[in-house]
Amino acid sequence: MDQVFAAIDIGSNSTNLLIVDQSGKTLERVVRSTRLGANIAKTGALSAEAIQRTLDCLREYEVLVKRHNVSHRRTVATAACRVAKNTSQFFTEAKKISGTEPELISGETEGALSFV
C-alpha cells in the first residue's frame, strides 16, 4: 500500500496544507488566510476569533487528510504560537480535531523547513 504524507504549517498569517504520495507527487496543496497572529503584538495572546478561524481551517484540512488516507502527518506551529500566552489552549483544541497536538518549532527550524 502506498504511503501518503501530510504537512500542516500553522503560521501567523496563513495555515498551509500539503499532501504528497511516496514519490513526492503533490496530491493536495491548500493555503488559507487564518491570521492567527492578528493583534498578538497588542494583547500577547491569540484572539478567540483568530483561534476559531484556524480551528475551522484545521477541520477542513482534516477532511482532506482522511480523503487521501494519509499515513503520516506533521503539524507545526510557528511564530505566533511561540510568543502567545495562550498557545496551550489553542493546541488543546487543535488536538481534538486531528488527534495530534501541533509541534511548536523554533524560528531556526522554521527557516530551515521553508527551503524544503
Where are these regions (language model features)?
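Nucleotide/phosphate-binding catalytic cleft detector across ATP-hydrolyzing
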Residues: 1-10, 18-116
